[in-house]
């Protein structure tokens, strides 16, 4: 019996880069096939070929034994294939129902039947266990909710082959469990699934088989994942041993650098108070919707501050815009890289230099292009950013390499004092995480105060000197590194009703 999906010797070349070289593996009906590899290994490129965005330069794709050619996304969808990319694709000013039914809205005499569409979508969402308002516009939803819309869109097309690229990267624990149930149901229903994730727990929880990519090549395939130790997968992914991914080292801390007192914003229910010392890494943990990102945006001047006070090195700080924050040496690496972090149409070099250009002016008028080029080359080498050259458009880089470029932007700032990192390793492989943690430690050694927001509890525990836990828009408590463990952090993060119910 033919495999539900077969990649046959797939090759793809971009200018200066061989993105894929001889990729061949099968995905069976009723199977979840994991795809792992470092950022830039070629996983997302393969899915773009499957989804009709790219054309292979060699090899081909077979669906149910039949050779297929996908000149467009529409051709891929028509063949029963659904690809859900890490970078979400939606229309922000349309509703949930309109996004889910885009191109097939029920109509009569040219008029769209909105009530019929909303009722249909509400029934389908309920059947999938997803709690979303069909009338809500995508722009007003969280990243996690938008992710669920994309997943539901693929499921509503009744696709036989479904590929998921980092689907849980922005989901809460509850939403992740809903997704896992959906994947299990689809497997039992005989669908063929490709599942890309950097989270080992997810791969072992969901996947029957697994293929490993490195530098565009297929380095290993495992028909039965249950028999493969985790250490083997990591070694095959990165080509080296990583015994301690966090490699935490204590360091001397200075005086209080950033202090927040009774800080309030439109999305913060009560005043938030905390301190961060020079050279200290303070991890912020909380469930989705706890208010962590909202608090960081208030500090950075991206959202309005409605109350409270900030001080920097003991002096009052009045930040009314992101420009004010950067001028005082406070920077933010945002959660949503695509929308708020990178300038997609600009080059890697331009993205690295965009903030510190004021330091590259000659006579206050002319850009020192040689200096900018040297700065970009230095950080590309230092952070091991995988790019053909500094002129490459940043949108063509993997998520991990885009994140490194954003970090390079702030490393290039000579007067850096506070670095806020919102989900700095979201959707990034284990090798790139290891390198990014090294950058965070280097910033701390320089005396920067580091505030790191993360939904990955092991990361918060592994990297932070101190942990602040938020719950329902408030700071619920804080823990020193020596007293912090998963149970203590979760007890602070979970709603009190949930804790009582669990007891």
From Swiss-Prot:
Places the protein is found: Cell inner membrane
Record Gene3D superfamilies: P-loop containing nucleotide triphosphate hydrolases
Catalyzed reactions per annotation: L-arabinose(out) + ATP + H2O = L-arabinose(in) + ADP + phosphate + H(+)
One of the Pfam families matching this protein, by short name: ABC_tran
GO molecular function, one term: ABC-type L-arabinose transporter activity
Keyword Cytoplasm carried by entry: no
Binding residues for ATP: 37-44
PANTHER family in the record: ARABINOSE IMPORT ATP-BINDING PROTEIN ARAG, CARBOHYDRATE TRANSPORT ATP-BINDING PROTEIN MG119-RELATED
Functional description taken from the UniProt entry: Part of the ABC transporter complex AraFGH involved in arabinose import. Responsible for energy coupling to the transport system.
Name of the protein: Arabinose import ATP-binding protein AraG 1
Organism name: Burkholderia thailandensis (strain ATCC 700388 / DSM 13276 / CCUG 48851 / CIP 106301 / E264)
């Amino acid at each position: 019996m033919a495999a539900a999906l077969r990649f046959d010797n797939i090759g793809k070349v971009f200018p200066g880069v061989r993105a894929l070289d001889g990729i061949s593996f099968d995905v069976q009906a009723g199977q979840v096939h994991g795809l792992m590899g470092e950022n830039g290994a070629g996983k997302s490129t393969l899915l773009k070929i499957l989804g009709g965005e790219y054309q292979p330069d060699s090899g081909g794709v077979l669906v149910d034994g039949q050779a297929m050619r996908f000149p467009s996304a529409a051709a891929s969808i028509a063949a029963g294939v659904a690809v859900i990319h890490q970078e979400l694709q939606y229309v922000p000013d349309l509703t949930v129902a309109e996004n889910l039914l885009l191109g097939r809205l029920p109509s009569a005499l040219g008029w769209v039947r909105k009530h019929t569409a909303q009722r249909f979508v509400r029934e389908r969402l309920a059947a999938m266990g997803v709690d979303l308002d069909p009338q809500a516009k995508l722009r007003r939803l969280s990243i996690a909710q938008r992710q669920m819309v994309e997943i539901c869109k693929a499921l509503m097309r009744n696709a036989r082959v479904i590929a998921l690229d980092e689907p849980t990267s922005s989901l809460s624990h509850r939403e992740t469990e809903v997704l896992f149930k959906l994947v299990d149901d689809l497997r039992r229903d005989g669908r063929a699934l490709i599942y890309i994730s950097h989270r080992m727990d997810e791969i072992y929880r969901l996947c029957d088989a697994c293929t490993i990519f490195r530098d565009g090549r297929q380095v290993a395939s495992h028909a039965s994942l249950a028999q493969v130790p985790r250490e083997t997968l990591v070694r095959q992914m990165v080509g080296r041993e990583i015994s301690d991914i966090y490699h935490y080292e204590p360091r001397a801390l200075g005086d209080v650098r950033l202090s927040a007192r009774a800080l309030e914003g439109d999305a913060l229910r009560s005043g938030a108070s905390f301190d961060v010392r020079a050279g200290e890494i303070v991890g912020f943990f909380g469930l989705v919707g706890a208010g962590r990102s909202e608090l960081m945006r208030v500090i950075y001047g991206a959202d309005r501050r409605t109350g409270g006070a900030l001080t920097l090195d003991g002096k009052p700080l009045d930040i009314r815009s992101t420009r004010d924050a950067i001028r005082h040496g406070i920077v933010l690496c945002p959660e949503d890289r695509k929308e708020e972090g990178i300038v997609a149409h600009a080059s890697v070099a331009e993205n690295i230099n965009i903030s510190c250009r004021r330091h590259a002016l000659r006579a206050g008028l002319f850009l020192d292009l040689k200096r900018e080029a040297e700065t970009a080359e230095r950080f590309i080498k230092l952070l091991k950013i995988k790019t053909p050259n500094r002129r490459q458009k940043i949108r063509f880089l993997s998520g991990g390499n885009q994140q490194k470029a954003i970090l390079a932007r702030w490393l290039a700032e000579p007067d850096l004092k506070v670095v806020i990192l919102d989900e700095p390793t979201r959707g990034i492989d284990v090798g790139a995480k290891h390198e990014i943690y090294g950058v965070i430690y280097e910033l701390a050694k320089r005396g920067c105060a580091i505030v790191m927001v993360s939904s990955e509890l092991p990361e918060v525990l592994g990297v932070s000197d101190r942990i602040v836990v938020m719950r329902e828009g408030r700071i619920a408590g804080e823990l020193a590194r020596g007293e912090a463990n998963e149970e203590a952090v979760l007890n602070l993060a979970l709603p009190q009703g949930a804790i009582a119910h669990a007891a």
